[in-house]
Amino acid sequence: MKERKFINEAVKRLLVCEYVVKETENAGFGNMVMKRTPFGTNITLYVNRPGLVIGRRGSKVQQMTDTLEKKYGIETPQIEVKDVKDPDLNPSVIAKKIALSLEKGWSYRKAGNTSLNRTIQAGAKGVLIKISGKISGERARYQKFIYGNVKYSGEPGSKGMITGFSTAKLKVGILGVTVKILNPEYKLPDVFSIENITGGEEVGTESKADQTDVEGRETGNAEES
């Protein structure tokens, strides 16, 4: 029963995330944090343009709150909208920008390289941009734009890399845009630092006070003899 409950909660969370992404797509969805509290469910949305999500006099937020409670069964949802601190380091925002550029007629190379350079200038340590679909010709293929430290497997790949995805609707079909950025706060296993310890006494050496005390005892013994 507990396993089924966990599965149902995971499915519900996924459905809520899909709904929120769809509703905030034009505002530049960045991330969603969902937490349960004794007073209800707190949902924090990080978007590039909060005003589009809040709506006039909070009408958009109220509409989303009602939908989450009635359609998805979220207990007393409380939505808080925050601005993305650095859009150029948020993979979801970057993926959406690339998709919009492709829909405006940009070539996939221009859209990919422009976003890659902007992300590098923002201080990213590792970036992967992948545009897939009928980007040139009738056959579907993909093009990658890579910079720096990019991890594909293991714990660094699953926990260290932040992923964002979006789609661009063109006449030739739908193009998929995947963006992965190495989390600046994640410490790679092969990166270490050596601390410089200062202010303490070296091991195996005697302090000046100890040496004086020893010399005094030796002198006293010599006088007695």
Swiss-Prot record:
InterPro entries with a match to the protein in the record: KH_dom, KH_dom-like_a/b, KH_dom_type_2, KH_sf_prok-type, Ribosomal_S3_C_sf, Ribosomal_uS3_arc, Ribosomal_uS3_C, Ribosomal_uS3_euk/arc
Keyword RNA-binding applies: yes
Start and end residues of each stretch annotated as Disordered: 202-225
Annotated GO MF terms: rRNA binding; structural constituent of ribosome
Residues passing through the membrane, by range: none
The family this protein is said to belong to: Belongs to the universal ribosomal protein uS3 family.
PROSITE patterns to which the protein is assigned, alphabetical: KH_TYPE_2
Listed NCBIfam families: PRK04191.1, uS3_euk_arch
Protein name per its UniProtKB record: Small ribosomal subunit protein uS3
Organism of this sequence: Thermoplasma acidophilum (strain ATCC 25905 / DSM 1728 / JCM 9062 / NBRC 15155 / AMRC-C165)
Biological process terms in GO annotation: translation
Lineage: Archaea, Methanobacteriati, Thermoplasmatota, Thermoplasmata, Thermoplasmatales
